[in-house]
Amino acid sequence: MVRFLHMSDTHIGAKSLTIEEREQDYYDTFQEAVEIAIDEKVDFIIHSGDLFDTWIPGNRSMKVFRDAMMKLNDRQIPVFYVFGDHDRPRRNSESAAGIFDFLGLHILGRDEFAGIEREFSGMKVFIGGISNMKGYLRNQLKEEYKKAESASTGYKNSILISHQALDPIFIPEQCEAKVNDLPMNYSYIAMGHLHDFVEREIGPLLSYPGSTELKSDREINGLLKMGKGINVIDLDNGVASLHRVKLKKVRYQFKVESDPENYLEEIKSILDKYANAIGEKKPIVNLIINGQISMEEVYEDLKKINGAIFNRPQILKIVDMPNVPSGSSELREYFQAFLKDQKLTDLAMKVFQHTADGDKEAIIREAAGEAIDN
């Protein structure tokens, strides 16, 4: 039997413009995943893309990755990796991660499918990879999957690594390929790009392990339902079995949408509800308030809560509809009620008519004339 760890979308080096602690969060969860690999005594690691948050990572990101590779290399744990859409080198540039190939890093399929045969515990394993292909490379992707199918013929144990969004697992309009385009003669298909955990039996076992840390508040629901984690895969006689391991160093996030009267209580309520899951790190709260309240008042209120970090709150003010005389059907009366200015009402009527006529030049002339008058 062969055992390996599958992780993806670690986004090492990602930062927040407003919360300084976020950069360290991505390092923490990546390093935790590496420690899990060592504790599980895996034979190798699969990383299916977006290792770094950018194709030109900073020195601190490179140092974190170098230290991890040295630790893995000391234990003879190689890493097989494809590029995602974030860390794929531009044109003829070299890969940042590639300088650590001497520490056991194998980059597969930069511009086309590539595969490698390795032996672990006396068992031959074929590992193939295709880096992210979108834009002008999208039309090439199906052909690369066909190459992958041909290359793995004759291997009992095989793994395909790919960083793509697949229909119907993801939104069809944002996908580069369909599940049916994948080669079905692999034991395990290690996907990357989606940040939530997905496991599917499609013939072979397919999985997106998801990101190791949240990149946006769209991932909050997935975090609260399943957590963030990595996959430990046992591969034996062509059959892959998946064991999910949750990461403990993930910083929790919450989204609270409320009104000026109740937002503080709702924040306290959700923090109490998930108190046992949050862990040592203060969670981040993304607050949206619907109603009339000043930002200064909100900031003063939030100082009363010590157990969370807050992104800049959003205040969505409710705009009162103009009071139009009952039974009115005149557009001018609507403009007058809303603008409360005769001159602006005249301008609005003219711009409306020019818009209806499709006369862009007349609209520009009216606007320019108004600017000169003022």
Swiss-Prot record:
It is an enzyme of class 3 (hydrolase). Keywords: DNA damage, DNA repair, Endonuclease, Exonuclease, Hydrolase, Manganese, Metal-binding, Nuclease. Mn(2+) 1 binds at residues 9, 11, 50, 195. Nuclease activity is regulated by Rad50. InterPro entries: Calcineurin-like_PHP_ApaH, DNA_Repair-Maintenance_Comp, Metallo-depent_PP-like, Mre11_archaea-type, Mre11_N. It holds the Pfam family Metallophos. The active site is at residue 86. Mn(2+) 2 binds at residues 50, 85, 163, 193. Binds 2 manganese ions per subunit. The keyword DNA repair applies. One of its GO terms (biological process) is double-strand break repair. One of its GO terms (molecular function) is endonuclease activity. Its cofactor is Mn(2+). Homodimer. Forms a heterotetramer composed of two Mre11 subunits and two Rad50 subunits. Belongs to the MRE11/RAD32 family. HAMAP family: Mre11 (MF_02044). Part of the Rad50/Mre11 complex, which is involved in the early steps of DNA double-strand break (DSB) repair. The complex may facilitate opening of the processed DNA ends to aid in the recruitment of HerA and NurA. Mre11 binds to DSB ends and has both double-stranded 3'-5' exonuclease activity and single-stranded endonuclease activity. This is DNA double-strand break repair protein Mre11.
